[in-house]
Amino acid sequence: MLTVFRHCAGWFVALSWLLFVVTVPICLAIGATAGVKTLAAPKASACGYVTDLIDKASPGPLFLPSYPTVESGPLHGAAYLYDNAVAAIALVGCGERDKADRIGAAILWAIDNDRTWHDGRLRNAHAAGVVANGSAKLPGWWDNTQNKWLEDRYQVGSDNGNIAWAMLALLSIDDVSARSRFRDGAARLGTWVAQWADTRGTGGFTGGTFGHEPTPDVRTWKSTEHNTDLACAFGLLAIRTGDSRWRDMATAAEHFVDTMWDPACACFAAGTAEDGVTRNPILALDAQVWPLTALPGAAKKFASAITAVEQRMSVDEGFSYGEDRDGVWTEGTSQMALLLELLGSTAKAKSLIAVIESQRSPDGGFYATSVRELPTGFMLDTDPTKPRLYFRLPHLGAASWAALAERGFNPFTATKGLP
């Protein structure tokens, strides 16, 4: 995943006019009062946890907070688009389509009610909560030192991979026989992404935009993960609408992913550099697992990627984000568990589910990682001197992928099967 801040941009936040570093202490609940033994209540299923998040909210279209326990700073009240899209798909897989509908309705609201853009794009994050009248709110925080309201440059941008996930969410919720508003919304998002088709190198789609309006930076790198997402989203949109132009875009994105395969290492490159040609050799777990889960025939064609992942990225019975193997990445371990389940490796999948369950937070959610800080191998877009990290915080994305793995539900097909 090349220079993509899918959900957590870390505590290092670049503002539109300066670089600003936010340091927030992380405090974890350890247990009951010293000397008193208590019996822990049984945890709800991952599906039950995500469903409960919806049930506890006020009625109406809704974005869920990505990091619900964070009380201040850039992550407080931030509802990352990717996390919410995965949550919506997980709810469909859990048999809770009506609850997924609430997130889908919020996505449609955000398309129509951005404070600046009216061209079919979405932001990487919106303010968590029930959407209200007026412009769709964006996350931010008050800085007492500067006496200003601040916004994160990544959160206000528009990554094409995140928008692809929003498309997948809308198409998962869509009832083909009864209504079209969700697939119409997916088509609007696809139309915005289409402008980023690239002719350099092996084609595909570039990254999207980064930073504030009116002139955000254009991201000219290309991501294997993004193009996997887009190949699937465009392909599903072609099926749902019967419009062949979406099939052409799906083919272009899938071709790019195919060319990122390196037989020598039995792995996919993360994508390209800004020139659109030079490969980024970083090994990222999702860039290995997602093509096999999402693309027709890929699980067989690139089966050796599973061995490469097991040999180079396994840690503590689970999987890390990259080759550093400093700790378990809960979300990625769920992705691997799901793939193995879909391939029929049930025993291996169940052993990974046990690892995922070990990362439960006190509220029944799931920590993003087993360690305080988990490196990804990438650097922050907002400050290239700082590493991009996952933190040991309860995370909506981790819980949603745990639910998908629990149900054996493929978010790329909205079924319990491979494409």
Predicted region positions:
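A beta-strand-loop signature enriched in Asp, Gly, Thr, and Trp
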Residues: 302-335, 339
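Loop-centered beta-sheet repeat module
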Residues: 218-266
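Active/binding-pocket-proximal capping segment
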Residues: 351-359
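Alpha-helical scaffold segments of alpha-solenoid architecture
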Residues: 266-285, 289, 293-300, 310
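Residues in the short coil linking paired helices within alpha-helical repeat scaffolds
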Residues: 96, 182, 243-246, 345
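Low-complexity, Ser/Thr/Pro/Gly-enriched N-terminal "stalk/linker" regions
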Residues: 30-156, 176, 180-183, 187-216, ...
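N-terminal Sec-pathway targeting helices
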Residues: 3-21
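Well-ordered alpha-helical segments within folded domains of soluble proteins
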Residues: 77-93, 100-101, 158-174, 221-238, ...
